A protein has these predicted regions:
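Active-site activation/catalytic loop segments of kinase-like enzymes and analogous catalytic loops
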Residues: 91-132, 146-165
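All-alpha amphipathic helical-bundle segments outside canonical DNA-binding/catalytic cores
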Residues: 4, 132-148
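A ubiquitous short alpha-helical element
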Residues: 29, 83, 107-111
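ATP/Mg2+ or Mg2+-diphosphate-binding catalytic cores
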Residues: 27, 132, 152-204
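Active-site acidic catalytic loop and adjacent metal/ATP-binding pocket
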Residues: 43-92, 98, 105
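A cross-family kinase active-site recognition segment
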Residues: 1-42, 48-59, 84-89, 165-184
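Soluble or luminal CAZymes and related metallo-dependent hydrolases
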Residues: 36-40, 113-117, 121, 145, ...
Length: 204
């Protein structure tokens, strides 16, 4: 069955907390960077406990970075990686498509969208979806970006650790070019300056 969390932010916070509990202590982040991450996790837990309204819920793809879409000749974008579908908040998919840590993941389609490009994409998305979804998603856009950043950051911490060992996350299962790109992107995303920049973006 397709997952359908009754409290999407609370479910995301629980998964992120479990990941950070396992991988953050040995991540080698600076004290300042660790403090930022822990502060944002506290924010997410507090926000999730207050935001219990599940709507608007739609079928979401979860892993909505640019590399998981194919652009057809008629200009339509088709999602091609249906590994993690869930009935969830569409704003989480929207956030995953535009925040830098997620948008830069793919070796060929990865990008670092500037603020103008990000905002233009969000505006186009809001105009394309049903009005009720747009209206109910708008107040959650910034919160969704923060939540998805934490989810993705936790994934990167796990990938950096487990990609170095044998197993399903091993970098040896990837081509050398893809493995090198993922490693560069993960290390850049875990850099102090990248973490500080993300924290600044949360206020914009």
């Amino acid at each position: 069955p397709i997952p359908e969390p009754t409290a999407p932010f609370k479910a995301l916070a629980a998964r992120a907390h479990a990941t950070f509990e396992t991988y953050l202590p040995g991540a080698g982040l600076s004290r300042a960077a660790t403090w930022i991450v822990q502060a944002r996790m506290r924010w997410l837990s507090d926000f999730a406990s207050q935001h219990v309204d599940p709507g608007p819920v739609t079928l979401c793809v979860t892993d909505a970075h640019p590399g998981n879409f194919v652009i057809r000749r008629d200009g339509r974008a088709v999602f091609v990686d249906l590994e993690k579908p869930a009935y969830n908040l569409p704003g989480l998919d929207l956030a995953h498509a535009v925040i830098a840590v997620a948008a830069g993941w793919d070796p060929t389609a990865g990008m670092q969208p500037a603020a103008a490009a990000r905002d233009g994409f969000v505006k186009a998305w809001m105009a394309a979806v049903p009005a009720e979804i747009a209206e109910r998603t708008a107040p959650l856009i910034l919160a969704a970006r923060q939540a998805v950043w934490l989810r993705t950051f936790g994934f990167f911490l796990r990938w950096r650790t487990e990609s170095q060992a044998d197993g399903p996350w091993s970098a040896t299962r990837l081509g050398p070019g893809a493995a090198a790109h993922f490693r560069r992107h993960v290390e850049a995303s875990l850099d102090d300056e990248a973490i500080r920049s993300a924290a600044e973006a949360w206020t914009a």
